[in-house]
Amino acid sequence: MDSKEVALDSRMATRKSDLHLFSKYVSVYYQTGLLEMLRENGCDTLFICGFSTSASVRAVAMESPQYGVRPVVPAEAVGDRDDYVHRSNLSDIEKKFADVVPVQAVVDYLKGRGGNGRKKGREDGNLG
């Protein structure tokens, strides 16, 4: 995107192989090819980051289990225009649809994976 408001944080280390999806719809599953890509690559977990917690983040967290995908929301990597709306939706998402975890838990989990996307060491799939 061309706007700084929706640009990726410059502190993020990215690779050419990283997939960044931007959708004009509430669900990133709609017309992006995400589900097909996840299935083709044997991915069963999706880390959901972005804006807004009450709309897009919630929609994807709700839809993911229906497709056999485990939704994980790094708590500090999502937001909304209103803090109360953000916090209440994040709490509801955690109670009903997804694992809501600290960003550091995701970082630690991803550090334990090999360059080919396969797990090294732990096989239980837990983040923390």
What label would you give each PLM region?
Residues 1-128:
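Active-site-adjacent betaalpha module
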